[in-house]
Amino acid sequence: MAFALISNRALTVKVEAAKKAAGTKQTKAAPAKSAGIEWYGPDRAKWLGPFSTNTPAYLTGEFPGDYGWDTAGLSADPETFKKYRELEVIHARWALLGALGILTPELLSTYAGVKFGEPVWFKAGAQIFSEGGLDYLGSPALIHAQNIVATLAVQVVLMGLIEGYRVNGGPAGEGLDPLYPGESFDPLGLADDPDTFAELKVKEIKNGRLAMFSCFGFFVQAIVTGKGPIQNLADHLADPGTNNAFAAATKFTPSA
């Protein structure tokens, strides 16, 4: 039954893709006019607000998250701009998942009493170097990871195959937008309305950029304090004058 449903869904996706291909060839689709003019077009919000007078001509506000900032001219070439947009969205989505995975176990362990083998994200991963290895999902009944080199090699191979399939336009995604495929990737139909879809694109990239900065901050915190982000936040709230970024930075300055 499940296989039949999946097959029917896949057939539907291919039929819809064929219909799109048979129709008029689509170019870059501009967002709906009523989708929040504050985020798109020439009158959108700029990175310096009213002081953003001379934004690059190639940043027209056509794409989500365009605040008219490109002082280094990295996106002046259209093909480069297209590649960077794709890379940013993909990394933003990974960062959103990563931030959720970093925060959730520590939150549940600290405030809900949920038992984890190790709730702190970098300490959990470090268990692969222990004698017993790393238990997937914290369950000894599942397969153990005991060799970091083998684990990395498997990840590189699997992710490389998937990314290669995606980049080269595998037949399963034929006719679909590589960044916003929809169809089976939107089972709840959240993007059916064009205005809502345009707004969701902006929300995704804004939150994704915050998530990328957050993950970088989690890495730095782990190196400097040896604690997870939730514990660092609790320490800061308990004693802001002692536990803050400036105090932590002094640990790396030459002593008098």
Curated annotation (Swiss-Prot):
Binding positions for chlorophyll b 4 per the UniProt entry: Q155, R166
Binding-site list for chlorophyll b 5: Q155, F252
Transmembrane parts of this sequence: 94-114, 142-162, 210-230
UniProt main location, coarse: plastid
Binding positions (chlorophyll a 1): W69, S75, E88, R209
Annotated residues for binding of chlorophyll a 2: H91
Post-translational modification: Photoregulated by reversible phosphorylation of its threonine residues.
Residues holding chlorophyll b 1: W47
Transit peptide residues according to the UniProt entry: 1-23
Binding of chlorophyll b 2, residues: R93, I143
Residues annotated to bind chlorophyll a 6: H236, A245
Annotated positions binding chlorophyll a 4: N207
Protein residues bound to chlorophyll a 5: K203, Q221
Biological role: The light-harvesting complex (LHC) functions as a light receptor, it captures and delivers excitation energy to photosystems with which it is closely associated.
Entry note about domains: The N-terminus of the protein extends into the stroma where it is involved with adhesion of granal membranes and post-translational modifications; both are believed to mediate the distribution of excitation energy between photosystems I and II.
PANTHER family: CHLOROPHYLL A/B BINDING PROTEIN
Subunit (UniProt): The LHC complex consists of chlorophyll a-b binding proteins.
Protein name as it appears in the record: Chlorophyll a-b binding protein of LHCII type I, chloroplastic
Organism of this sequence: Chlamydomonas moewusii
